[in-house]
Amino acid sequence: MQKTFESKTATSKAVVVFSGGQDSTTCLIQALTQYDEVHGITFDYGQRHREEIEVAKSLAKRLKITSHKVMDVTLLNELAISALTRDAIPVSHELMENGLPNTFVPGRNILFLTLAGIYAYQLGAEAIITGVCETDFSGYPDCRNDFVKAMESALVQGMDKQLKIITPLMWLNKAQTWALADKYQQLDLVRHHTLTCYNGVIGDGCGDCPACHLRKRGLDDYLQNKAAVMAELDASEPKA
């Protein structure tokens, strides 16, 4: 999926898979500069850090997006056992025997992108935007570019509609993602008003879970090397 940084695209409507975290909020901010209509969709799957739903609602209002839908998909909680769906399972820094982190929720992005695709179909939108990333790989197979391409193909063939899944962060590291927020003058908003923490702490988070470690490492790198990281981001933009 090609990253896009132009001020406008040919597609006037986009659906953003929006959790209220750093990555999806950064994608939402960028989308507002590129599309005439930006529709957010947030999923309630009984997640451990379900405070993110209220954060997403607040940010959607603050950023004045076209519409924001919160969808109940708590059935996923019944089917997928994970540290993110069971409070009794502590978030671990170690990988499980199958090589995946215990925060992996099987089928989550398959379900999210399928439902976002149906929503985009009804809205007449031609793009779904999601903040998945392969560069700072967290071990989630459903964040890989190959998976996204496969999902896009399935949606196009299954609904007989031209639909793009756009992944602006796919090849950016976390420092470059912070730079992207700063590029749109929204670094402070993303830093202090998003929720990435698996333990549900807004802003800089608990400081202990894997999500907080990755977020902090990227922020520290960006703040210490702003010019260099911004130059890397600019170099990654597609040339006209």
Curated annotation (Swiss-Prot):
Residue positions binding Zn(2+): 197, 206, 209, 212
Enzyme class at the top of the EC tree: ligase
InterPro entries per UniProt: QueC, Rossmann-like_a/b/a_fold
SUPFAM superfamilies with a match to the protein in the record: Adenine nucleotide alpha hydrolases-like (SSF52402)
Keyword Hydrolase: no
Signal peptide: none
Family the entry assigns: Belongs to the QueC family.
Function according to Swiss-Prot or TrEMBL: Catalyzes the ATP-dependent conversion of 7-carboxy-7-deazaguanine (CDG) to 7-cyano-7-deazaguanine (preQ(0)).
Name the record gives this protein: 7-cyano-7-deazaguanine synthase
